[in-house]
């Protein structure tokens, strides 16, 4: 199958090009000049970009990762392609070991089925799991249930890792509670990303965590001590150390656009990662109330979700294609930085850049075609439309 457009994102620029896709292998077989062969699909001036990857998303359409329900997870994977997502990490919230173990086993089961037969679980590919908690600061817990926020426990984590079939790719933790940085070092040694978040760490403590193998920061600005010119905290460390990745929620509610612009100016085109941090409310009517981590949460008209009892911001319902639009149109971020933030950089973060994240021969045919308003015209997940 041959696709073509006059605006294909290749080698960090827009080019007129054809993409040859194998529907059998799900790979990009080659990229050629526009019009060089008869195209099966000609998208004219529509933008063609790599498939989006969301490495921090709790759920959507009424489902939450912690629910441990197969059908909910399948429905989620099938529907998030509507926003251009071709790969994602179902993300847990802090809870009891029993609840988390069931959730991890559920994701692992569905992911195994999808890997064995991609038609059995159509839609976006489950690329792993993001374990957000339980190793978080009680002070900066946000909407996470406080009673389950505990210090890092290496033996417990090993049980979680086994339950996940080795699918845990990212662990968010409060590094100030990681005695001797044992958990951080263990994660790094085993190819798992230690990401600082929901933490009261100082800039110096964050720097030591990076020196011990931490590689990322979870939703920069949120769930941590704020940046101050005398104590810049985790945000300051994320800005200073260029090789560290940083997530950011680009909905205009979690962070002001000037703060988003500052973040990407500091991180450049290679280390900023856009995430949705979406809750089960995505795709549901305004005013819906549901439990999140045992707490009652309500969906507001602006797309944000808040704890009913305290009004605390609990998460978002951001769609990744809308986040891309926000980066370009509202935050004023350059195209290369904006596109990389939802494609190549998340792939690099989780060590999948050899097969994901860019339009290149030999990589998976994860392709999104965007209209002028950034809505999705069509999508290919591993070559399947």
For every predicted segment, state its role.
Residues 6, 26, 45, 56, ...:
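Divalent metal-coordination and catalytic microenvironments
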Residues 78-89, 137-165, 208-220, 231-245, ...:
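Active-site gating loops and adjacent loop-to-helix segments of metal-dependent hydrolytic enzymes
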Residues 1-49:
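Histidine-rich, glycine-flanked metal-binding segment
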Residues 58, 74-106, 123-137, 164-176, ...:
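Divalent metal-dependent hydrolysis catalytic cores, especially in the metallo-beta-lactamase
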Residues 158, 162-286:
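Active-site core of metal-dependent hydrolases
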Residues 104-132, 139-203:
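Metal-dependent enolase-superfamily TIM-barrel catalytic cores that perform enediolate-based chemistry
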Residues 46-48, 55, 65-124, 148-163, ...:
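Alpha-helical scaffold segments that flank or form the walls of functional sites
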Residues 233-246, 264-276, 282-363, 367-370:
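His/Asp/Glu-enriched, well-ordered alpha-helical/loop segment
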């Amino acid at each position: 199958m041959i696709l073509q457009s006059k605006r294909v994102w290749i080698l960090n620029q827009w080019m007129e090009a054809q993409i040859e896709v194998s529907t059998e292998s799900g790979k990009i077989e080659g990229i050629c000049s526009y019009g060089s062969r008869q195209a099966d699909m000609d998208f004219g001036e529509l933008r063609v970009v790599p498939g989006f990857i969301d490495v921090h998303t709790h759920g959507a359409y009424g489902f939450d990762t912690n629910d441990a329900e197969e059908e909910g997870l399948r429905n989620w994977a099938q529907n998030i392609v509507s926003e251009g997502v071709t790969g994602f990490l179902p993300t847990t919230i802090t809870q009891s070991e029993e609840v988390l173990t069931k959730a991890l086993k559920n994701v692992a089961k569905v992911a195994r089925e999808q890997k064995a037969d991609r038609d059995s679980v159509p839609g976006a590919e489950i690329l792993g799991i993001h374990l957000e908690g339980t190793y978080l600061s009680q002070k900066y817990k946000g909407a996470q249930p406080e009673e389950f926020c505990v210090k890092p426990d290496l033996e417990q984590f090993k049980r979680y890792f086994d339950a996940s079939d080795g699918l845990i790719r990212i662990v968010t933790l409060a590094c100030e509670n990681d005695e001797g940085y044992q958990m951080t070092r263990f994660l790094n040694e085993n190819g798992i990303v230690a990401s600082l978040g929901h933490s009261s760490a100082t800039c110096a403590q964050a720097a030591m965590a990076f020196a011990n193998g931490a590689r990322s920061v979870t939703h920069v600005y949120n769930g941590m001590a704020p940046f101050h010119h005398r104590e810049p905290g985790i945000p300051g460390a994320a800005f200073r150390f260029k090789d560290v990745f940083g997530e950011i929620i680009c909905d205009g509610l979690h962070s002001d656009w000037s703060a988003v612009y500052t973040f990407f100016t500091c991180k450049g085109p290679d280390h900023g990662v856009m995430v949705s941090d979406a809750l089960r409310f995505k795709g549901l009517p305004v005013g819906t109330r549901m439990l999140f981590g045992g707490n009652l949460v309500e969906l507001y008209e602006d797309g944000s979700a808040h704890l009913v009892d305290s009004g605390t911001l609990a998460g978002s319902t951001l769609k990744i294609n809308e986040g891309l639009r926000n980066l370009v149109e509202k935050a004023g971020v350059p195209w290369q930085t904006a596109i990389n933030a939802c494609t190549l950089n998340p792939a690099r973060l989780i060590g999948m850049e050899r097969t994901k994240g860019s339009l290149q021969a030999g990589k998976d045919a994860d392709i999104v075609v965007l209209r002028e308003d950034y809505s999705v015209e069509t999508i290919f997940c591993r070559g399947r439309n």
